[in-house]
Amino acid sequence: MTRARDLANFTRSISDTIAERFSKGTSETVLWSKTGDGTAETQVDVRVEVGNTVIAVPEGTSVSMPSLSAGTDYAIWLETDGSLQATNNHTTPPSTGARKIGGFHYAPGGNATAQSGGNSTAQINEYSFYDLGWRPSCPDPRGMTLVSENFWSDIYLLNTDPDTNGTSAFGVTIADGSSPPRIPSAFGGNGTTTYGGFKWYECQEVFAAYGKKAPTYAEFMALAYGVTEETDRGSDPGTTQLDSARTSKWGVIQATGNLLVWGRDVIADGTGSGVWRDIAEGRGEIFTFNDDLLAGFFGGAWGDGAKAGSRSSYWSFSVSYSDTFVSGRGVTDHVILP
């Protein structure tokens, strides 16, 4: 089943979901705690309505795990007998009547513990845990990680088929100027046609289709913290894959020194003569005081060496620029519900 169909099935609002009883001992933390590379348990007690029955699940209840596969998102279901089961199926319950109440990402490598990147041991990303009251604001929480309990970031760079894969998936072709993404159905896509390139405009539009945004400079600096600074990968990665040296504290993978990512910020030169400029691809014109409107690139690319890093940024490129070393990464707000 495609991500697009998953999103179409997500018809209830978050508040409607919570209205079906889900009450944790505290709303100030996520329900789950990582207890090992591939194990987890509840870290607070919770009462959950499953069908017509309210089930009490105590703190310290283990989640039954399947054989975990690196780079995969798992849903956590509460069974009618009170047990917890993780599966990689996010739409069909593992047993009749089970209710999905959270999930996590099983990453291909560990998060950074200092400012020297992560490791290559596949494990649960503890910052990817979510539940019905602690989650990203976008409809689909998969492939995301919580940055400093402030906002959520896509773990992976944008891929070429986000309607199928979501905007953040492991082992797929990275979207860039040479391999632009398919136009999302929300903006008239037919499942086949791609953008002509990957300009700032396309980046913002793609993420908007899934309830996300490109990061601000401040957000990027935070999400990329913990990478091995002033280093690059050395070659075009082509696909979303582990680059442990440039994994951040929060488990953002290929965070720097792989492909540049478009930012949300734009700047305009206030000098010269202001005129209307036809630079918005047939969707109106932009009044600026210089030849163009500029946007930021963050993180550094695979050949940038010491220029790459969590605070690396370029501010000299037009919003209409597109190239093979420019991609995107989505972010969205953090939601806490009582």
Regions found by a protein language model. Give the residues of each.
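Short, intrinsically disordered N-terminal pre-domain segments
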Residues: 1-16, 336-338
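Glycine-rich, flexible loop motifs
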Residues: 12-72
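Elongated alpha-helical scaffolds
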Residues: 69-84
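Acidic glycine-/aspartate-rich tracts in secreted/extracellular proteins
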Residues: 80-84, 157-160, 227-228, 265-268, ...
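Short, surface-exposed terminal/edge motifs of secreted or surface/virion proteins that either
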Residues: 80-94
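Short aromatic-cysteine micro-motif
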Residues: 107-253
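Disulfide-stabilized, aromatic/cysteine-rich ligand-recognition loop
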Residues: 197-198, 286-338
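An exposed tryptophan-centered "aromatic clamp" motif
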Residues: 209, 219-303, 333
